[in-house]
């Protein structure tokens, strides 16, 4: 079974409920509490996205991108001991105000600039295996655009973002 990064947009009240209850957090991580449109499956893209940003841009953008993928705080530490949880990757979140800040910062990051920093054999530059694709730029571009759009919508709707590996 593949382990990929998942993000979901939630209202602050839903995040608060998940902080109080591991059962509620499990329902969220089981895709039962929010519409499909509020989910983003980032596949294995976080590491290549971070490395591409590191190669192309300043630390302000790298910090914002890292926060967008890692969150600021674990949602509910008790969830690590819940049946079926992936304890090596705790569920974390960004509160609504942090989402606004991260989305605003990422808005200044130009995807074409990030992609231009990648050589043709970019998988090695990204510290990743080549897998089935020789050129990683399309993969990075798709996931980068999806992440930026996801955060723009979360900021517009004043939602928090919860992230985990599943």
Q: Model-flagged regions — what are they?
A:
Residues 160-165:
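A structural signal for short, well-ordered beta-strand segments and their strand-loop junctions
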Residues 1-149, 153:
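Acidic (Asp/Glu-rich) sequence patches and key acidic residues
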């Amino acid at each position: 079974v593949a382990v990929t990064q998942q993000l979901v947009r939630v209202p602050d009240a839903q995040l608060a409920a998940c902080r109080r209850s591991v059962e509620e957090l499990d329902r969220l991580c089981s895709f039962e509490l929010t519409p499909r449109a509020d989910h983003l499956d980032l596949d294995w893209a976080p590491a290549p996205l971070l490395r591409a940003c590191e190669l192309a841009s300043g630390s302000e953008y790298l910090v914002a991108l890292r926060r967008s993928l890692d969150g600021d705080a674990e949602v509910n530490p008790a969830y690590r001991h819940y049946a079926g949880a992936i304890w090596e990757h705790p569920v974390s979140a960004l509160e609504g105000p942090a989402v606004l800040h991260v989305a605003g910062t990422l808005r200044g990051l130009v995807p074409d600039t990030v992609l231009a920093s990648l050589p043709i054999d970019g998988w090695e530059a990204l510290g990743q295996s080549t897998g089935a694709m020789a050129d990683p730029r399309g993969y990075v571009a798709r996931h980068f655009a999806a992440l930026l759009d996801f955060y723009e919508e979360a900021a517009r709707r004043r939602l928090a973002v919860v992230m985990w590996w599943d």
